């Protein structure tokens, strides 16, 4: 047992009684328990001490204390005093001090460690033993922490389905199958009794499997996230509340009503009691919409989707026709289904195929069907004709629009070719050149290079345009040496300015001595560096090669200036990316440091190839650039125009005053009066006034 150090002892403790009765000990323990119950916080330091001291006192017997018992009792009183001081301190400080709300986790941990260290001075061993003796205290101390951890764990474990993810689309595929199953087979089973009775076990298994998927779909919908101000909401309570406010929630609940219980009364040969399962049709439409968005052939999918809708309508109409025939009586007249007592018409397959044939003829208004006889038959045929007209109009309209959309790009491209042909015929272009033009258009169409990228991307925001350009062109631009270490912002600016260009076989991209206004990056194709005769090839450039980057930088001291130093010719059809000098300089205006770095890289490349005159470079380094001079001239011209406009206005004002003065003098001479005209008075007004007075 550890001893109490003298620095923690108190002089009054030397007057403790040597003999202490059991009543006194019980009174002390009861007082401690009352103090513990009245305190608002868990005294983790006091409880181990009480446990150890009371155990030691009980073991020491009912007689007088030994020296060890006195030490234990002293330690107990010391713990009581320290606990009381801490309790008073916490009451003075307040239960929720303002700085603790903003104190970080590290500061809180440090403060708690300091308080625990002060509480555990000289009593580390009893505290360790007390933890095992007081498991309830440990539980009380960590209650709040455990609750917070459980909440965090629940938040982490909460599964939220992203409606744009592949997992959600797969689930849509899974739930669309039972919905389509119910829409196609429920009506068929309800109208054709043999189909329901002969395969009853199969239908029961499929029906309740579909019900299980329906229930799971409700859970998925309750955990499906939605966007709020562009952010995905993942709070499960908000998701559930949002789902409950939708109309689909009511339809989902109605589709899960256990109407199958009616089987107990009417029997299992009435599957129409499950017609409430048809209310989940929105899942099927959602699956079709998302598939149309994901597929690479949306027009073909729309046509297939339209055909599927028409087939379902024809199928339902056929089943209803057979049900009406059964209600009226098979074979009672020429309009209803023939008598099923005839073996040929009693087969299930013949019943369905005959009904489907009649429905197709009626809805498409093709061919002749037996005329109706009874009033209900007339009403049904009238409704069928109206539905058939609607179907015909839908087919014509949708198929026509789909075909026009599919051929829109082809028609637009063909219109361009026709206009070019008419122009060449009007200008009497040679057949050879006309053939080259037509072949160039054929190459563009065959390689799908007819799309105008700017026209396609103009509806997108600048951020998405930049991301698409980075995804398409950034790797290509990084191949150029001078752009490899550039800032990311400059590269983004440059990729937005790259323009695709196509050259025909034999076309010159540049000739020796031409002024360099663009640089080129080969995306696809082969170019040849040829001699002046255009035949001798020095080197062949392939995909990924680039040229012309030095000539668009205007590097001072370059022996060739900004002129081309070689002849480059296209061997076949070549697809290049072009970056003009104006676009580069426009992008570099916001990145002056990058401009200096690019010029330095270009200068090093020229020095390596011995294509730079250092004296000329040093001599041309002091004067300002030509662009700066042009800007200064432009600003000076604006100033001169402003001054000239001001002088012109002053001249006009002076002229107006002179004219007014001359008019006054003229009126005075003619009228003989000495009174001058007032400002703004028209000559002759004074004379008119005098005449009126006379």
Swiss-Prot record:
Forms heterotetrameric channels composed of CNGA3 and CNGB3 subunits with 3:1 stoichiometry. GO terms for molecular function: cadherin binding; calcium channel activity; cGMP binding; intracellularly cAMP-activated cation channel activity; intracellularly cGMP-activated cation channel activity; ligand-gated monoatomic ion channel activity; myosin binding; protein-containing complex binding. Residues 193-198, 267-270, 322-347 are extracellular. Prominently expressed in retina. It is linked to Achromatopsia 2: An autosomal recessive, ocular stationary disorder due to the absence of functioning cone photoreceptors in the retina. It is characterized by total colorblindness, low visual acuity, photophobia and nystagmus. It is found in: Cell membrane. Gene3D superfamilies: 1.10.287.70, 1.20.5.300, Helix hairpin bin (1.10.287.630), Jelly Rolls (2.60.120.10). The keyword Cell inner membrane does not apply. It is a multi-pass membrane protein. Changing residue 557 to R: In ACHM2; the K(1/2) value is shifted toward a higher cGMP concentration by a factor of 3.0; no positive influence of the CNGB3 subunit in the cGMP sensitivity is observed; average cGMP maximum current is decreased to half of the mean wild-type value for the mutant CNGA3 + CNGB3. Its main location: membrane. The lineage of its organism: Eukaryota, Metazoa, Chordata, Craniata, Vertebrata. This is Cyclic nucleotide-gated channel alpha-3. GO terms for cellular component: axon initial segment; dendrite; glial cell projection; intracellular cyclic nucleotide activated cation channel complex; perikaryon; plasma membrane; transmembrane transporter complex. Keywords: Calcium, Calcium channel, Calcium transport, Cell membrane, cGMP, cGMP-binding, Coiled coil, Disease variant, Glycoprotein, Ion channel, Ion transport, Leber congenital amaurosis, Ligand-gated ion channel, Membrane, Nucleotide-binding, Sensory transduction, Sodium, Sodium channel, Sodium transport, Transmembrane, Transmembrane helix, Transport, Vision. It comes from the Eukaryota. Residues 365-368 are annotated as: Selectivity filter. Residues 488-608 are annotated as: Cyclic nucleotide-binding domain. Changing residue 590 to K: In ACHM2; also found in patients with cone-rod dystrophy; the dose-response relationship for cGMP-activation is shifted toward a lower cGMP concentration. Residues 1-24, 109-152, 662-694 are annotated as: Disordered. The gene is CNGA3. GO terms for biological process: inorganic cation import across plasma membrane; monoatomic cation transmembrane transport; monoatomic cation transport; response to cAMP; response to magnesium ion; signal transduction; visual perception. It catalyses: Ca(2+)(in) = Ca(2+)(out); Na(+)(in) = Na(+)(out); K(+)(in) = K(+)(out); NH4(+)(in) = NH4(+)(out). The keyword Transmembrane helix applies. It comes from Homo sapiens. The record marks 392, 396 as: Central gate. Pore-forming subunit of the cone cyclic nucleotide-gated channel. Mediates cone photoresponses at bright light converting transient changes in intracellular cGMP levels into electrical signals. In the dark, cGMP levels are high and keep the channel open enabling a steady inward current carried by Na(+) and Ca(2+) ions that leads to membrane depolarization and neurotransmitter release from synaptic terminals.
